[in-house]
Amino acid sequence: IGGFECNEHEHRSLVYLYNSAGFFCAGTLLNHEWVV
């Protein structure tokens, strides 16, 4: 909402969740096991 596009690998902790229908959520990588 009101954001800007970023380059691939610009935000290394950003998580993009999707399924066969497409994008459904985003999150932040906390460590190698956890996404919030």
UniProtKB/Swiss-Prot annotation:
Pfam families: Trypsin (PF00089). InterPro entries: Peptidase_S1_PA, Peptidase_S1_PA_chymotrypsin, Trypsin_dom. The keyword Secreted applies. Residues 1-36 form the Peptidase S1 domain. It is found in: Secreted. Its main location: secreted. Its EC number is 3.4.21.-. Keywords: Blood coagulation cascade activating toxin, Disulfide bond, Hemostasis impairing toxin, Hydrolase, Protease, Secreted, Serine protease, Toxin. It comes from the Eukaryota. GO terms for cellular component: extracellular region. Expressed by the venom gland. GO terms for biological process: proteolysis. One of its GO terms (molecular function) is serine-type endopeptidase activity. Monomer. Belongs to the peptidase S1 family. Snake venom subfamily. Thrombin-like snake venom serine protease. Shows strong hydrolytic activity towards Boc-Asp(oBzl)-Pro-Arg-MCA, a synthetic substrate for thrombin. This is Thrombin-like enzyme TLP. The lineage of its organism: Eukaryota, Metazoa, Chordata, Craniata, Vertebrata.
